[in-house]
């Protein structure tokens, strides 16, 4: 069963690109929704992971300008698509996905991400088989798959359909970095937390030996996997507040593009 969870709309504002020109002020409104696939009921002991191959995690964006849809025939759409495409390095190098495709479908720009850390076989080893073998065990998490992050952004400009593309990029970076830090890392660390995914990448080969060393069986595998996901020290907020040595903090300059002026 699939269900959608929508986050509160966020509003951003910036002045004109030249001398903080008030006339060139740009406003934007951002709304994001995640799609979750899994059992109908949820509880506090849920483990969220990205949709695994052959499925892929989709990052989907569509754009509006002054409440009007920006369509793929427009030059502005092309420039915004280039901005979205510039995030490939972030998804691949910091969150350990492979970007399989950057496509345009029905006026949406879609990134298709393949997880390089988890597979269905590993989920079977870590969760499904221990659950079947140890029916008496408690504390096992229920698996849910995050299949899509969909974002709609509405830009507002006093100058009609004129917008500096270089002025748009900070809005992209500020929104997505704040969304990841304040929401996605806490709710879906195995999908969007660099440190959680990095720890899983480093530690997954050690989980089975630890479980068998302590219990002579696989009973602890689901619990240890869930412990990695639930460790709040993996969040960027924790790393910043503690200012301690540890895994590197993410670089949130996610989007980039040389300054280009668009005028319809």
From Swiss-Prot:
The UniProt entry's coiled-coil ranges are none
Kindly list the places in or outside the cell where this protein is found, as annotated in its UniProt entry.
Answer: Nucleus
GO annotations under biological process?
Answer: meiotic DNA double-strand break formation; reciprocal meiotic recombination
Source taxon at top rank: Eukaryota
Return the Pfam families for the record. REC102 (PF21736)
The reply on keyword Lipoprotein is: no
Identify the keywords attached in UniProt to this record, alphabetized. Meiosis, Nucleus
Alphabetical list of InterPro entries matching this protein: REC102 (IPR048920)
What cellular-component terms does GO give this entry?
condensed nuclear chromosome
Is Ion transport among the key words of this record?
A: no
The annotated consequence of gene deletion is: Reduces meiotic recombination several hundred fold. Specifically affects meiosis, and does not have any detectable mitotic phenotype.
Q: What more is known?
A: Despite weak sequence similarities, may correspond to the subunit B of a SPO11-containing topoisomerase 6 complex specifically required for meiotic recombination. Retains some of the structural features of the ancestral archaeal Top6B subunit (AC O05207).
Q: What does this protein do?
A: Required for formation of the SPO11-mediated double-strand breaks (DSBs) that initiate meiotic recombination. May mediate the interaction between SPO11 subunits during meiosis. Also needed for homolog chromosome pairing, synaptonemal complex formation, and for the proper timing of the first meiotic division. Not required for mitosis and mitotic DNA repair mechanisms.
Q: How does it assemble?
A: Interacts with REC104; seems to form a functional unit with REC104. REC102-REC104 interacts with SKI8-SPO11 and this interaction is required for proper subcellular location of the proteins during the initiation of recombination. Interacts with MEI4, REC114 and SPO11.
| Family note | Belongs to the TOP6B-like family.
Any idea what this protein is called? Answer: Meiotic recombination protein REC102
Native species: Saccharomyces cerevisiae (strain ATCC 204508 / S288c) (Baker's yeast)
| Taxonomic lineage from the root | Eukaryota, Fungi, Dikarya, Ascomycota, Saccharomycotina
Name the gene. Answer: REC102
